[in-house]
């Protein structure tokens, strides 16, 4: 157990018997009342956001974590098979842990996996931006290129994103894995 004053953004704590990551932590002392910490947390099992007010002298259970880099190999039913880049050991990571960004994973991508002190997987962090090839999209007509609209495109991983009209099949684009949005065209 450690004091809430020793916790910072990004720390992982056990709150109500489940792992939560601290996304924001603000110390407040309102008028003549006692000081407290307002914490914005994300439950790592359910993905729900939680707001909680800790008293200034309250203690929390800090989870000791270990971060390792793994390489994505393939998908096996509901799990993603990853390989440790240093020991070549393979593990299965549940699709719920990776979440929506999993649709942008392609073989060979590197993923940071965070383990709890008991060996369980807390979260998997994909690169913020990935470069993927557009495999299918409607061809743009001359009139379409003059407007600033967008059109759907299917990427090499099967994910669908909206892209500008000038993007064509076989173009390489950069996608933000957090939002699933097109960022820019990559010139190679």
Swiss-Prot record:
Pathway: Protein biosynthesis; polypeptide chain elongation. GO terms for cellular component: cytoplasm. GO terms for molecular function: translation elongation factor activity. Keywords: Cytoplasm, Elongation factor, Protein biosynthesis. The keyword Amino-acid biosynthesis does not apply. The keyword Lipid biosynthesis does not apply. This is Elongation factor P. It comes from Prosthecochloris aestuarii (strain DSM 271 / SK 413).
